[in-house]
Amino acid sequence: MRTPGPLPVLLLLLAGAPAARPTPPTCYSRMRALSQEITRDFNLLQVSEPSEPCVRYLPRLYLDIHNYCVLDKLRDFVASPPCWKVAQVDSLKDKARKLYTIMNSFCRRDLVFLLDDCNALEYPIPVTTVLPDRQR
């Protein structure tokens, strides 16, 4: 009996399970995911520790990576006074620092700012979904 050559074995290996992420994340996708994660974590922190003074006085944190003011917002957030009692604040500041570094150095050429409205980061417009007439 003849043993199979290397070609069938190679084809079997290549036809195996596909990779979980076929393409690496881009600068834009990394910035977008990290900004959404930071905004979500900030909102959870506001709900879980609302009475803690250092949480209550943190700068508001709504991030829109298409708004030029987001860089100032991140810098202000990272520079806010330390919060020794709530470890999540330090974790959040580390993520904000990481996003600022990514936006300001690694991905600077990939950024396209569509807005320069700092008030939009303070008081974001809530996203509403309007259903088409047939789904009402």
Swiss-Prot record:
Protein's UniProt keywords contain Aminoacyl-tRNA synthetase: no
Subcellular location: Secreted
Signal peptide (UniProt feature, chain positions): 1-22
Expressing tissues: Specifically expressed in CD34+ hematopoietic cells.
Name the UniProt record assigns to this protein: Cytokine-like protein 1
GO molecular function, one term: signaling receptor binding
Residue spans crossing the bilayer: none
Lineage: Eukaryota, Metazoa, Chordata, Craniata, Vertebrata
Record flagged with keyword Transferase: no
Gene that encodes the chain: CYTL1
GO BP terms in the entry: cartilage homeostasis; chondrocyte differentiation; chondroitin sulfate proteoglycan biosynthetic process; inner ear development; positive regulation of transcription by RNA polymerase II; signal transduction; transcription by RNA polymerase II
InterPro entries on file: CYTL1 (IPR029253)
